[in-house]
Amino acid sequence: MLRWTTAGESHGRALVAMVEGMVAGVHVTTQDISAQLARRRLGYGRGARMKFEQDQVTMLTGLRHGVTLGGPIAIEIGNTEWPKWETVMAPDPVDPAVLADSAARNAPLTRPRPGHADYAGMLKYGFDDARPVLERASARETAARVAAGTVARAFLQQALGVEIVSHVISIGASKPYDGPPPQAADLTAIDASPVRAFDAASEALMIDEIEAAKRDGDTLGGVVEVVAHGLPVGLGSFTSGDNRLDSQLAGAVMGIQAIKGVEIGDGFETARRRGSVAHDEIYPGADGVMRSTNRAGGLEGGMTNGLPVRVRAAMKPISTVPRALATVDMATGEEAVAIHQRSDVCAVPAAAVVVETMVALVLARAVLEKFGGDSLAETRANIDSYLRAVATREPSTDGARASG
């Protein structure tokens, strides 16, 4: 079973990603991970931190000469600001006199931000300061997820030729993009867009939204879409809820900071249609069955159906609002304004890259559960055997459609 976890705090020495259960023989390098982390820093409306956040990657274990060994993989992402925080965030006790020299950074944060983990985290864990909460709850943690996901992406591409691409559907109240989903070849152009939009008209509307929010001292959320091309029929299962691939994808994506909604395929729009126009009709074709639509987003009954998997995620506006929202000072019980940590106006373009990451990890796990293997070569052999078996069971005809 493929497993992953992360460790570390936003202003700690480093973040660490752990990946366990990856087969041997997958080619992945420090440069590959750095390239994906650079994509995570993209986006119009990002804050000052992106200017000096360098994401210093160190491969600690699990690889030799750029190839996975089959054991646990550990990846460290160093914090370039650590010297400024070394005293305040030190793991070991610090002399109070020394700590006093960092009084500004060490001041208790007692005014929780609405929409953030501050309030519930302070009460749940017994903290009188939000610092221990926000350090781990921060979206900075997603850098470690991207590192782990890079390994999963490499496996998917090398085992099956799977390509994963994302784009931003809308930001704030901008008109949502409603054209065809992007192909893998479109990724370079999407990354070149300041908001990672797939078309120029949508890009202009999104930038206008961000500029207006910036002028008003506000923040924005939005909707992103991830598309995975090249998956075979049959990943996941209908046998129980937790085996359904769409439930696994939804759970993983909802676990990303600030994500408040997930849909597969046309999702909520499907609920507004009649059944006669909500599903993807099946027709005979020369190379097997074919579809003229992909409203289900490549998943039916919890299993991939051979079409691209489409996952959308809704990101709420960042909860650190420059003009500060009303709150209560937890130390005094009095009305106050929320603390303001350095933040972005909009991080939706970066969130799309993180959603790619979680989709890649879940899909890689599903592939390994289905096909197994200790090495990439063994997994490929199992995949090839399965695909041949599926091909013999799939109907094929040169006849014309009877309907549609």
Swiss-Prot record:
A single BP term in Gene Ontology: aromatic amino acid family biosynthetic process
Can you state which reaction this protein catalyses? 5-O-(1-carboxyvinyl)-3-phosphoshikimate = chorismate + phosphate
Q: In which pathway does it act?
A: Metabolic intermediate biosynthesis; chorismate biosynthesis; chorismate from D-erythrose 4-phosphate and phosphoenolpyruvate: step 7/7
Q: Which cofactor does it need?
A: FMNH2
Keyword match NADP: yes
What general EC class does the enzyme of this chain belong to?
lyase
Q: Which GO terms describe its molecular function?
A: chorismate synthase activity; FMN binding
| Positions of NADP(+) binding | 40, 46
Keywords on this record? Amino-acid biosynthesis, Aromatic amino acid biosynthesis, FAD, Flavoprotein, FMN, Lyase, NADP
Enzyme Commission code: 4.2.3.5
Name a GO CC annotation attached to this entry.
cytosol
One of its Pfam families is Chorismate_synt
Look up keyword Flavoprotein and say if it applies.
Answer: yes
The annotation note on the cofactor reads: Reduced FMN (FMNH(2)).
**Where do the coiled-coil regions begin and end?**
none
- Binding of FMN, residues: 136-138, 257-258, 301, 316-320, 342
CDD domains of this UniProt entry?
Chorismate_synthase (cd07304)
- Function, in words: This reaction introduces a second double bond into the aromatic ring system.
Q: How does it assemble?
A: Homotetramer.
Similarity comment text for this entry: Belongs to the chorismate synthase family.
PANTHER family according to UniProt: CHORISMATE SYNTHASE
Q: What is this protein called?
A: Chorismate synthase
Protein's organism: Mycolicibacterium vanbaalenii (strain DSM 7251 / JCM 13017 / BCRC 16820 / KCTC 9966 / NRRL B-24157 / PYR-1)
Query: What lineage, starting at the top, does this entry show?
Result: Bacteria, Bacillati, Actinomycetota, Actinomycetes, Mycobacteriales
